[in-house]
């Protein structure tokens, strides 16, 4: 699992499976998009306006990448 925060876009992405694959985007809420693979497994979670939706400090204990 990889957690990436894009500060410029305030986007938090949680990759549950880092293998390259084709995915479909399934919007489940105004600010939450799931990446679903061909077998309907969730392989990623995208949270838009992340700083408003989650406490980003929770992820300090997780090894995450911060990008510009």
Language-model-detected regions and their locations in the chain:
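Small, basic N-terminal interaction modules of short regulatory proteins
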Residues: 1-68
């Amino acid at each position: 699992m990889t957690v990436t925060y894009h500060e410029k876009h305030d986007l938090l992405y949680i990759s549950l499976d880092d293998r390259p694959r084709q995915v479909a985007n399934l919007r489940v809420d105004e600010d939450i998009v799931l990446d679903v693979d061909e077998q309907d497994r969730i392989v990623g979670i995208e949270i838009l306006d992340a700083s408003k939706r989650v406490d980003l400090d929770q992820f300090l204990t997780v090894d995450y990448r911060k990008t510009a």
